[in-house]
Curated annotation (Swiss-Prot):
<keyword id="KW-0963">Cytoplasm</keyword>
<dbReference type="GO" id="GO:0043023">
    <property type="term" value="F:ribosomal large subunit binding"/>
</dbReference>
<comment type="similarity">
    <text>Belongs to the RRF family.</text>
</comment>
<keyword id="KW-0648">Protein biosynthesis</keyword>
<dbReference type="Pfam" id="PF01765">
    <property type="entry name" value="RRF"/>
</dbReference>
<dbReference type="InterPro" id="IPR023584">
    <property type="entry name" value="Ribosome_recyc_fac_dom"/>
</dbReference>
<protein>
    <recommendedName>
        <fullName>Ribosome-recycling factor</fullName>
    </recommendedName>
</protein>
<dbReference type="InterPro" id="IPR036191">
    <property type="entry name" value="RRF_sf"/>
</dbReference>
<dbReference type="GO" id="GO:0002184">
    <property type="term" value="P:cytoplasmic translational termination"/>
</dbReference>
<dbReference type="InterPro" id="IPR002661">
    <property type="entry name" value="Ribosome_recyc_fac"/>
</dbReference>
<comment type="function">
    <text>Responsible for the release of ribosomes from messenger RNA at the termination of protein biosynthesis. May increase the efficiency of translation by recycling ribosomes from one round of translation to another.</text>
</comment>
<dbReference type="GO" id="GO:0005829">
    <property type="term" value="C:cytosol"/>
</dbReference>
């Protein structure tokens, strides 16, 4: 593996870490309605646990209400039960073939708990990014030791990987601040 391949590989893994952070934060409920928080819910579809997004369309009715419309009328009760039984503390109400999921306002205490969870997720992602940097640097050192790349190439690649790490950490901080602001906005 060359230095360029190591850099490309490390950059791709760092981007995946950022995407993973974004998707895990999307599941954290803020005061506003966001169909993304329902995506991890699985519905019993003819005996098979199936993601909600595959058995129903999700949309927003207004800023605090999510509309869930099952593709089959027979699935309304199962979808409603799956949402109610989830760990989100939501109380869906069916109106014919549409299920309305109102988002209750968060208490101040709950908002603070959620910001702690968000910070923790961010720190975990930063640790993952730093571990990727460490692995890449170790790989570069091995290549230098085996005389596959020069020390100058190693130093250049190490500097570029450090810049990628710094950029990823700044991006993580931006994502965290944005999510905290979203949670704390009443």
């Amino acid at each position: 593996m060359s230095a360029a391949e190591i850099k490309t590989n490390t950059d791709q893994k760092m981007q995946k870490s950022l995407e993973s952070l974004k998707s895990s934060l999307a599941k954290i409920r803020s005061g506003r309605a966001n169909p993304g928080i329902l995506e991890h819910i699985h519905v019993d579809y003819y005996g098979n646990p199936t993601p909600l997004s595959q058995v129903a369309s999700l949309g927003l009715a207004d800023a605090r209400t999510i509309n869930v419309q099952p593709f089959e009328k027979t699935m309304v009760a199962a979808v409603e039960k799956a949402i109610r039984d989830s760990d989100l503390g939501l109380n869906p109400a069916s109106q014919g073939t549409v299920i309305r999921v109102p988002m209750p306002a968060l208490t101040e205490e709950r908002r603070r708990e959620l910001t702690k969870v968000v910070k923790s997720e961010g720190e975990d992602t930063k640790i993952a990014v730093r571990n990727l940097r460490r692995d890449a640097n170790e790989h570069l050192k091995r290549l230098t030791k085996d005389k596959e790349i020069s020390e100058d190439e190693e130093r250049r690649a190490t500097d570029e990987i450090q810049k990628m790490t710094d950029k990823a950490v700044v991006d993580i901080d931006k994502i965290i601040v944005e999510k905290e602001k979203e949670i704390m906005t009443v």
